[in-house]
Amino acid sequence: MTARTLMIQGTGSDVGKSLIVAGLSRAFARRGLRVRPFKPQNMSNNAAVTAEGGEIGRAQALQARAACVAPSVHMNPVLLKPQSETGSQVVVQGRRVGTAKAREYQAWKPRLLSAVLDSFDHLRAEADLVLVEGAGSASEVNLRAGDIANMGFARASGTPVVLLGDIDRGGVIASLVGTKAVLDPDDAAMIRGFLVNRFRGDPSLFADGMALIAARTGWAALGLIPHFPEAARLPAEDVLGLKGSVRPSARPGARVIAVPVLPRIANFDDLDPLRAEPGVSVVLVEPGRPLPAEADLVLLPGSKTTIADLIAFRAEGWDIDLAAHVRRGGRVLGLCGGYQMLGRRIEDPHGIEGEVRAVDGLGLLDVVTVMTPDKRLAAVTGASLPDETPFCGYEMHLGETRGPDAARPLLRFADGRPDGAVSADGRVCGTYVHGLFADDRQRALWLERLGTSSAGEAYEAGIDAVLDRLAEHLERHVACDALLALAAG
């Protein structure tokens, strides 16, 4: 039996496509359906490791969790990881296949479509329902030739589309009606209905708006979805998810963790468990602002291009702020790329990251990193040292780091391998492990080191509870039975 398929496309970026697919995945999974999420092409530096040892966009990993299945490389067969303003690393079915500038990538698309359809068929063979998420805006008709992310995929796979608009940003009628106006008629015919997301207030006040959109487009009105504030508790994939929380007011008595927002910040969902703690204020420091003097911990996050981000870090004067923080007795933690920056030197003999082949590090750890072509992708478990507190997380990095401070590892993996480094005074640390703070035991340990305590809430269980409430929210406000009826079989 062939799975039914349905695609959620958007009138623009950040209209809530990922969230709606996650919520619908949980809603239909709770009905007993075997659900698989799918996004043909994603662009993000926030990635997750799959059981196959590949990588996919973090949003698809969350959607897989919502569907109550393990994430697979087939859920996001093409992942673009930006390395510059014009170029990206290209990951196909979980494996890095090269880098391409935007114009070059257009020539790649025809051959990538076969990989996309192969992964799609793989998921259809094991599911009752495949929920597909589009990318960006459905109305970008200038990119239609060779498209594999929106209507190009919908047409190639015969997947019907529901168009999602965001009323919170204004102009939702124009964005929905206007999308139909600019689409090729054959593309527009793939759209069977529409949803309006993030409504605030009395829904009866927009009843005539829903009717107007339906009349102008001929599409079925499938739901007016009220704003869901708890969405902020779910891991964000886009850097847009970091906006609006820069330099928040510190809660009285809270420990301050300062995080510089690097140009190519990656895997920043490492911060989410810390942001959920009432005893912590995570201060996201944007370019143009100094690292706050009141910080208890400066956390250097992951980076897609470590050398370029280190150069940008210095250009902001943050290296001076960080040195002053250390002299005041403050703590420093580097995660993955941030760990590499803390060393004496970073070398890139193969030019993996670009033209700069070597750069001096921040010199806070006596280690040297050499970039290597092979990427380490794996789920890991082990214990921190010397306290032997267990942890689970994942590795996703290029490069090997060695030096005297690495003889004092921060962690030890279950297979006995050491990871990370600790300075002689114990106040500067680095590790390659992502997801450390999502482990309740490790988060409690780090907060204790900062002189506070965890609220004791199970972070992962909290994510599932929010997904359940999101599913209930959508069941109330979306015509879910009608969505199933629209899905192609």
Curated annotation (Swiss-Prot):
One Pfam family linked to the record: CbiA
A single MF term (Gene Ontology): ABC-type vitamin B12 transporter activity
Active site: C336, H434
Keyword Amino-acid biosynthesis: no
Pathway it works in: Cofactor biosynthesis; adenosylcobalamin biosynthesis
InterPro entries tied to this protein: Class_I_gatase-like (IPR029062), CobQ/CobB/MinD/ParA_Nub-bd_dom (IPR002586), CobQ_GATase1 (IPR033949), CobQ_synth (IPR004459), GATase_3 (IPR011698), P-loop_NTPase (IPR027417)
Record keyword Cell wall biogenesis/degradation present: no
Domain GATase cobBQ-type: 254-442
BP-aspect Gene Ontology terms: cobalamin biosynthetic process
Key words of the record: Cobalamin biosynthesis, Glutamine amidotransferase
Family: Belongs to the CobB/CobQ family. CobQ subfamily.
NCBIfam families: cobQ, PRK00784.1
Annotated function: Catalyzes amidations at positions B, D, E, and G on adenosylcobyrinic A,C-diamide. NH(2) groups are provided by glutamine, and one molecule of ATP is hydrogenolyzed for each amidation.
UniProt-recorded name of the protein: Cobyric acid synthase
Species this protein is from: Methylobacterium nodulans (strain LMG 21967 / CNCM I-2342 / ORS 2060)
